[in-house]
């Protein structure tokens, strides 16, 4: 069977969220770059893959998927179902909870920091809006307090097993490490240990190697 095709840019943490899971699941895939400066993400052929003209999009044979977390779940179901814990009702429910936490709590606090510190200088030649950064750092710290409490009870977010919920944090947190605020994790020893453990995995190292924002 032909490898899956992941369309997008490896500087997008939504794309590399999928890479973390594809790598961890041992899936066969290739990355098909899109040139945003040429509007390739809005071209008809890409709109056929993702009708919103965004990335990522995944092609597996005649199946086209979009939305990064949906892609991640599909890859797990196909290649490594244990990352979803679908065989256990309670464990799979906790995976779902923490994937939702990443989507609705962690990433909304993190994304404005990444935009201000990485995207704004790179794309617009403008300095970060420090007020926006500080406001969202405070939001992120509140989220990390919840993570710290959770990780005192188990090694990973859903339990004592790695899951798609952990892997979904990798790309964004790698980008956090490229900002002046990487040390925010240091105040939370269990979060820091969890992150160190994640970054020792080959899947996370692959993501880090692909995501190299300009200095």
Swiss-Prot record:
UniProt keyword terms in alphabetical order: Transferase
List of residues binding glutathione: 12, 41-42, 54-55, 67-68
Pfam families: GST_C, GST_N
Keyword Transmembrane helix: no
Domain GST N-terminal: 2-83
Gene Ontology biological process terms from the UniProt entry: glutathione metabolic process; response to toxic substance
EC number: 2.5.1.18
Main EC class the enzyme belongs to: transferase
Tissue and organ expression note: Constitutively expressed in roots. Expressed in anthers, callus, panicles, sheaths and stems (at protein level).
Induction: By the herbicide safener fenclorim. By drought stress.
Molecular functions per Gene Ontology: glutathione binding; glutathione transferase activity
Family membership: Belongs to the GST superfamily. Phi family.
Function description: Conjugation of reduced glutathione to a wide number of exogenous and endogenous hydrophobic electrophiles.
Protein name (record): Probable glutathione S-transferase GSTF2
UniProt organism field: Oryza sativa subsp. japonica (Rice)
């Amino acid at each position: 069977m032909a490898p899956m095709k992941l369309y997008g840019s490896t500087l997008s943490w939504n794309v590399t969220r999928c890479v973390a899971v594809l790598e961890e699941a041992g899936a066969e895939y290739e990355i098909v770059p899109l040139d945003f400066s040429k509007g390739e993400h809005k071209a008809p052929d890409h709109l056929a893959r993702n009708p919103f003209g965004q990335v990522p999009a995944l092609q597996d044979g005649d199946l086209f998927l979009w939305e990064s977390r949906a892609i991640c779940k599909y890859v797990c179901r196909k290649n490594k179902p244990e990352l979803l814990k679908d065989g256990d009702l309670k464990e799979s429910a906790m995976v779902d909870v923490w994937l939702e936490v990443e989507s609705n709590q962690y990433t909304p606090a993190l994304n404005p920091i990444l935009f201000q510190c990485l995207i704004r200088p790179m794309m617009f030649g403008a300095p970060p809006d420090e007020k926006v950064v500080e406001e969202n750092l405070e939001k992120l710290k509140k989220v990390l307090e919840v993570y710290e409490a959770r990780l005192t009870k188990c090694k990973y977010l859903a339990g004592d097993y790695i899951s798609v919920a952990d892997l979904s944090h990798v790309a964004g947190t790698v980008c956090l490490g490229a900002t002046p605020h990487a040390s925010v994790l240091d105040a939370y020893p269990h979060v820091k240990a969890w992150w160190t453990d994640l970054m020792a995995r080959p899947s996370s190292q692959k993501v880090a190697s692909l995501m190299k924002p300009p200095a």
